Regions:
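Rossmann-fold NAD(P) dinucleotide-binding segment
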Residues: 55-66, 83, 211-230
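N-terminal glycine-/charge-rich "phosphate-binding" loop or analogous flexible N-terminal tail
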Residues: 1-48
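Short beta->alpha connector loops at strand-helix junctions that form conserved
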Residues: 32, 72-73, 89-100, 177
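Short glycine-/small-residue-rich Rossmann-like dinucleotide-binding loops
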Residues: 54, 74, 200, 206-208, ...
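Phosphate-binding beta-alpha-beta segment of Rossmann-like dinucleotide-binding domains, i.e.
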Residues: 89, 95-149
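Rossmann-like dinucleotide-binding domain for NAD(H)/NADP(H)
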Residues: 227-229, 233-315
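Rossmann-like dinucleotide/phosphate-binding beta-alpha-beta segment
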Residues: 136-226
Length: 315
């Protein structure tokens, strides 16, 4: 196969990872970000596009001559897959590269909440501990993960590893299968309403699809125990964020979120105005992005391109 022209449309979403490895395939161009009206010009003459969030739709595929679409993520909702198949354009995503990173961030956020890390760090950094008459401070109660009922929504690869870690902490793990097809012998399977009613902690690790969109709304949040913790490390759009903000302030619900329906977060978002700020941890979609995970991601994109070349050798 001839040398390829490869274009990366949103390199900023990959951070400080070195992309020079793609030069070995031919000509490589990289753009920090790409607006919708810049896609056509930048992809003219390109054989391969690397995209994380930039949409590759029918219009792009009709006006450009792409042979391969490399998605620098697991989710594929930014590409019109049916039309790509019709146009005989190969589409490759990357799965499994960020499992350890997401699991680690899940528990980093959860433990920060359970152990009131924000409160106690602020207490010390503000100089209040210096003024104390005793060696400790118990103003914000902390609690253990051991013995808690830990519900997982979406028991895929990440969900299973979260279950394993939660079990190691001594939590009692159960799960709800969003597809309805998962029957795991190691953990108790519950229907969604029962899981929400019973669990002290509920952790979402599901994709966004027709079965999970708006899965957790006001009704579902009201089923949860007062003071329970809801975590979303799956996709925005699964949880009604306005209803969650209300539940945090009115029912003492606590939450750890790494994904929102609109990203970046919108100005005036109800979660920015909650009164119980120590009950809420929000990170900007970083769970996937350890340095190790991003290095693995690039290596797997390279492998996808190499496999494509082998499959089309002689064409």
């Amino acid at each position: 196969m001839k040398k390829l022209t490869i274009v990366c449309l949103d390199a900023d979403t990959l951070g400080d990872i070195n992309l020079s490895v793609f030069n070995k395939f031919g000509e490589f161009k990289s753009y920090a970000t790409t607006k919708p009206d810049e896609r056509m010009e930048r992809l003219m003459g390109a054989d391969v596009v690397i995209t994380n969030k930039v949409i590759i739709d029918k219009d792009v595929m009709d006006r450009c001559e792409l042979k391969l679409i490399c998605i620098s993520a697991t989710g594929m909702n930014n590409v019109d897959l049916e039309y790509a198949k019709l146009k005989n354009i190969a589409v490759k995503n990357v799965a499994g590269y960020s499992t350890n990173s997401v699991v680690q961030q899940t528990f980093a956020s959860l433990l920060a909440l359970l152990n009131q890390i924000k409160f106690y760090d602020n207490y010390v950094q503000s100089g209040e501990w210096v003024k104390s008459d005793i060696f400790t401070n118990l103003d914000a109660p902390i609690s253990e993960l051991a013995g808690k009922k830990f519900g997982i929504i979406g028991l895929g690869e990440i969900g299973q590893k979260v279950a394993s870690v939660a079990s190691a902490f001594g939590a009692k793990v159960c799960y709800f299968s969003t597809s309805g097809a998962n029957n795991n012998a190691f953990y108790e399977r519950l229907e969604l309403d029962e899981l929400l009613k019973q669990c002290d902690i509920v952790s979402i690790h599901a994709p966004l699809n027709e079965k999970t969109k708006n899965l957790i709304g006001e009704r579902e949040l009201n089923l949860m125990k007062n003071g329970a913790i809801l975590m979303n490390f799956g996709r925005g759009g699964i949880v009604d964020e306005g209803a969650l903000a209300k539940a945090v302030d009115e029912r003492g619900l606590r939450a750890c979120l790494d994904v929102l329906e609109a990203e970046p977060m919108l100005a005036g978002h109800p979660l920015l105005s909650v009164k119980n700020k120590n009950s809420l941890i929000i990170t900007p979609h970083i769970a996937w992005a350890s340095s190790e995970a991003r290095a693995t991601l690039i290596a797997k994109i390279v492998q996808n391109i190499e496999n494509f070349i082998k499959e089309n050798d002689g064409n």
